[in-house]
């Protein structure tokens, strides 16, 4: 197995990030520093990162979390805020979030130790759909505003791609995007005159929040993980 893939399977980082870790000289194999991500290794190769020996690939798992507002979607936080890792009991597995969800947003977030899958779900080329429900200000949402969201709107970092948009109530919309820019849904809604008051992610690819209570988590079934891999 290639060294970068081995690190990803061991839960160190996504495969792309693992390649950077290797090239930075932070990885040793049998006590020798290795900077080639393509180096072949196996469970007997005595791989270490920053001097810490790896036990070998962990069983690959994916958890769904219903993140509350105020919880940050990072593995650790320098300001001492609670993180999504505190919502999951995973028997010591090294999990990390698949993408981000703003601290002031809530809803569905995935955690995994499968670096290859995480990369597939977040890389722009795969256009994985993510669905949100937004409560907005600015009065009743017009069909004109919805049409603009469906076409794509101009943002400060370039136009957004066409999105799925439908009105659920006068001030609530469901929005499905296939991009993952910073605070994108909030910026799109503001661009059509409807600043977001409350935002919840309810869908990620084929997965839905579906009754998972706020602050709770569950491990995805094999079938659910395979559906994610098929995206």
PLM regions: where:
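Basic, flexible Lys/Arg- and Gly-enriched helix-loop patches that mediate nucleic-acid binding at interfaces
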Residues: 1-231
């Amino acid at each position: 197995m290639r060294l970068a893939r081995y690190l990803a399977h061991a839960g160190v980082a996504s495969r792309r990030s693992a390649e950077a870790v290797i090239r930075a000289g932070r990885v040793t194999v049998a006590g020798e520093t290795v900077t080639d991500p393509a180096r072949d290794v196996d469970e007997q190769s005595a791989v270490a990162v920053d001097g810490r020996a790896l036990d070998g690939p962990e069983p690959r798992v994916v958890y769904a979390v219903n993140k509350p507002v105020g919880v940050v979607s990072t593995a650790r936080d320098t300001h001492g805020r609670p993180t999504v890792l505190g919502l999951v009991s995973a028997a010591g597995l090294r999990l990390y979030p698949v993408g981000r969800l703003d601290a002031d947003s809530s809803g569905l977030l995935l955690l995994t130790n499968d670096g290859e899958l995480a990369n597939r779900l977040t890389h722009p080329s795969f256009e994985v759909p993510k669905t949100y429900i937004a409560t907005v200000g600015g009065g009743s949402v017009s069909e004109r505003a919805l049409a603009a969201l469906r076409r794509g709107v101009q943002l400060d970092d370039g136009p957004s791609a066409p999105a799925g948009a439908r009105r659920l109530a006068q001030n609530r919309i469901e929005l499905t995007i296939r991009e993952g820019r910073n605070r994108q849904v909030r910026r799109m809604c503001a661009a059509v005159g409807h600043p977001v008051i409350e935002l919840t992610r309810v869908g990620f690819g084929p997965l839905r929040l579906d009754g998972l209570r706020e602050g709770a988590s569950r491990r995805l079934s094999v079938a659910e993980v395979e559906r994610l891999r098929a995206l």
